[in-house]
């Protein structure tokens, strides 16, 4: 009852995003009862901060202080006000520094969903104010324009397949496996070795498989930094492309692709796949 039953780390989808007038959380009154219960549940043990990789590296993020600052405002009776959270209560730098790794949530004895709180405030910064950490805007532009975060030539995505005798999926043909390679395995030479090894395994298995020529970035990065609009556009494009083909299982090459395809795509119409 006190915790979400959805997968840990799942970012809530904004329904009918083009019709919304506000995005994320920018004022205290926008927090719901569960968010406020989380603030009150903090026992101030500091385990979240102790395991935060950004904090341990000397960065500006202190998960404990974020929750305590929000709790303090709540106890002072600010729940009905229109007080702006950033920078009055929480600094922009701390929100933008979060990697959304979830270590704080795993360690919290009260199971406070710290990352979700940060994500909601960061979504407001991204979609309402256009504020991102340094370098993020360029990465988002790359995903939108060429389908990968590094701005590399989309025509070179499958160059590493040369000589491997791997088929591109065709409509009307059934495949046991559709191999979702992902951007890292497609462009990074070290990760290409892993993808090639997986192809050898698939060939030895005797299963029919193919890759999808239209594959592009799953845009998980966009969602994590708060750019939900780009994420939804990219996701719907990927789902539409996947639905052209007949396959039993979708095999993801990396944990980021796996989590996105398995846990987040099902939020969208026709986004349910056996991953």
What are these regions (language model features)?
Residues 271-275:
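Short, flexible loop segments at boundaries between secondary-structure elements
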Residues 27, 50-70:
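Juxtamembrane segments of multi-pass membrane proteins
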Residues 30-39, 61, 65-67, 74-270:
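Iron-sulfur-cluster electron-transfer modules
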Residues 42, 52, 98:
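Short cysteine-rich clusters marking metal-coordination/redox-active sites
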Residues 46, 54-56, 70, 112, ...:
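Active-site proximal loops enriched in glycine and acidic residues that flank catalytic Cys/His/Asp
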Residues 25-26, 47, 92:
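Short, charged/polar, low-complexity loop and linker segments
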Residues 45-48, 52, 104, 108:
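The canonical Cys-X-X-Cys-His
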Residues 1-25, 30:
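Membrane-embedded alpha-helical bundles of multi-pass integral membrane proteins
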